[in-house]
């Protein structure tokens, strides 16, 4: 979902199995975010190559590498060129997430979603409170200026290179 709730096709390199959305329901109890307005797992078996071994250890695969290095986001530059996304903005959301939003959450769709944003450079996977994500996004919207975008872009490069807070 893009700016003002307009649906768009977001391009990404596939890092998850084709049935990832169908398998989401069975994993909802493990959601670090606590509800279904946003979904994150410590170890996601829907990621290509990820397996839980018989002894309980986790084995990661190529999909995890693609996600940790943020390579899966690279095709979103096409969305920026098409005008659906911005380099910096709020996190893009799914339709089923939007349907569960309260009024104050909808501020996140007032601007174009971005490839990166305040949430991504402020802890990414370490943030497990949806209201904190909303707070960071609304703070970005309220304080937006060109300098803030440059700061976030530079911080994004640092975050990606150091793989800080990556999924």
Residue ranges with predicted function:
Residues 1-167:
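Conserved small/aromatic sequence motifs within transmembrane helices
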């Amino acid at each position: 979902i893009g700016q003002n709730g307009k649906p768009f096709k977001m391009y990404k390199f596939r890092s998850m199995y084709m049935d990832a959305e169908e398998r989401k329901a069975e994993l909802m109890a493990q959601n670090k975010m606590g509800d279904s307005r946003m979904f994150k797992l410590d170890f996601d078996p829907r990621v290509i190559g990820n397996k839980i071994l018989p002894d309980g250890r986790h084995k990661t695969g190529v999909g995890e590498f693609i996600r940790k290095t943020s390579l899966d986001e690279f095709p979103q530059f096409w969305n920026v060129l098409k005008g659906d996304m911005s380099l910096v903005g709020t996190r893009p959301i799914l339709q089923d997430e939007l349907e569960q939003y309260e009024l104050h959450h909808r501020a996140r769709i007032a601007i174009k979603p971005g490839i990166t944003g305040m949430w991504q450079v402020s802890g990414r996977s370490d943030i497990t409170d949806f209201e904190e994500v909303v707070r960071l996004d609304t703070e970005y919207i309220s304080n937006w200026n060109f300098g803030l975008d440059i700061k976030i872009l530079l911080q994004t490069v640092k975050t990606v290179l150091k793989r800080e807070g990556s999924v």
